[in-house]
């Protein structure tokens, strides 16, 4: 099996090396062909490495830097002034071919700006998109993109997002001809703005994308569609609203189960089942948003991710690297454009 290398921004996120380093060690146990480069303050990183000798340590490399992109840094400032930051160096390792993927829990805007400048977009792709999984009633994840990388998109960009989302679903979940839809205010052909309508018309004539039409917001979690495409403004609000509703449901459920002696007694009896249901709704299980459409792989973790959640982001990056996701997107787009122009 070919060895893979992940470049990890060890200082990113709310918890820094306290979370990123132990998660990296766990990833090495799961992926025997994986190597990880930890970028950040060497002294801080070494505090969280195993003290006893471990064979896995031979697959860890540390690149020392004390500069960090903060959550308060504006993207343009980070791009111009944080040239020795752990985030930038991790991305440069991907650009220079020393790592197959970069993982960071740091400033999202800065990561997207740096990634686009350093890694460049694939031929035929105008803008990268941020995509992540959402839980669905079927038990299988649903991909939603864009989640905020592009607050406004024309029809061509939405078309490109549909291609990239379809390929990502095929690569990570090995789903043959995943169902792709555009998020809209109605399912009728006359509904929606010009950009969405025009993107739908293009996709209807693209045989290599299994486009099924428009879906409304209440269809997102049914699992009837595998990939849902929208601009970043709509996608980000949808994602944040969904996370808020999930928190509300958990809060109300816990509150209701503490309401009275008999209810508390019943809750103890059904606690394992309730825990299983809540576990499926836990955003940590879906941690890791991919910035796709670039010449390299970039995965963004939630800033407040714990060790288990950050491990999910590392697993996602390793899977995308094994599947050679950028090459798959490039080849699919070339094939589609060839069909359109023939």
UniProtKB/Swiss-Prot annotation:
Keyword entries, A-Z: Cytoplasm, Lipid biosynthesis, Lipid metabolism, Phospholipid biosynthesis, Phospholipid metabolism, Transferase
Localisation per UniProt entry: Cytoplasm
InterPro entries linked to this entry: FA_synthesis (IPR003664), Phospholipid_synth_PlsX-like (IPR012281)
GO cellular component terms, A-Z: cytoplasm
Pathway(s) per entry: Lipid metabolism; phospholipid metabolism
Keyword Lipid biosynthesis: yes
GO biological process: fatty acid biosynthetic process; phospholipid biosynthetic process
Catalysed reactions, as listed in the record: a fatty acyl-[ACP] + phosphate = an acyl phosphate + holo-[ACP]
Biological function: Catalyzes the reversible formation of acyl-phosphate (acyl-PO(4)) from acyl-[acyl-carrier-protein] (acyl-ACP). This enzyme utilizes acyl-ACP as fatty acyl donor, but not acyl-CoA.
Assembly and oligomerization: Homodimer. Probably interacts with PlsY.
Protein name as it appears in the record: Phosphate acyltransferase
